[in-house]
């Protein structure tokens, strides 16, 4: 018998997080987006089908985490996520510039934002002005709303939900 070897499809992931928040409630809603980004950092490994290569956070400060080895990058990325602060004004243009400079190939650009419609409109404007370059079609804009993020991850079990499952009401 001949065993067919399939090539491993590896994609580089560029994670962009827009930490725009006007109120305390907006800031609290971004906590799930930050946790989602942290989970992506922890799941990224040389053996996975994708590997987190760069992360940019636009909040009170603009932070760019570049690769410096898998373990060092993961540690730096998690530290940046732990220390990031939301803000009513973020460096959106810098975030979009990093997204557009990412190039093509086996690269996935994921932009998590609480204002997806505004981001999509801005990307369309850049495309219409001819400033977008080749990368605009490769940017996935994901809403930071809880309902949207929970489609991709499950929140940790709380004691109440774990207790009701254990109780076995049928």
What kind of region is each of these model predictions?
Residues 1-170:
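Exposed, interaction-prone extracellular/peripheral surfaces
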């Amino acid at each position: 018998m001949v065993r067919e070897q399939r090539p491993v499809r590896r994609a580089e992931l560029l994670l962009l997080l827009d930490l725009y928040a006007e109120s305390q409630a907006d800031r609290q809603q971004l906590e799930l987006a930050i946790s989602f980004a942290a989970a992506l950092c922890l799941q990224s490994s040389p053996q996975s089908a994708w590997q987190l290569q760069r992360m940019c956070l636009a909040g009170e400060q603009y932070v760019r985490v570049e690769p410096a080895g898998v373990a060092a990058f993961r540690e730096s990325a998690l530290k940046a996520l732990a220390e990031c602060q939301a803000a009513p004004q973020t460096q959106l243009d810098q975030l979009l510039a990093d997204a557009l400079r990412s190039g093509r190939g086996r690269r996935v650009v994921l932009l998590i934002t609480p204002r997806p419609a505004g981001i999509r409109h801005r990307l369309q404007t850049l495309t219409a002005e001819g400033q977008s370059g080749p990368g605009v079609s490769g940017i996935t804009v994901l809403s930071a709303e809880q309902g949207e993020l929970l489609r991709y991850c499950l929140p940790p079990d709380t004691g109440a939900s774990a207790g009701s499952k254990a109780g076995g009401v049928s």
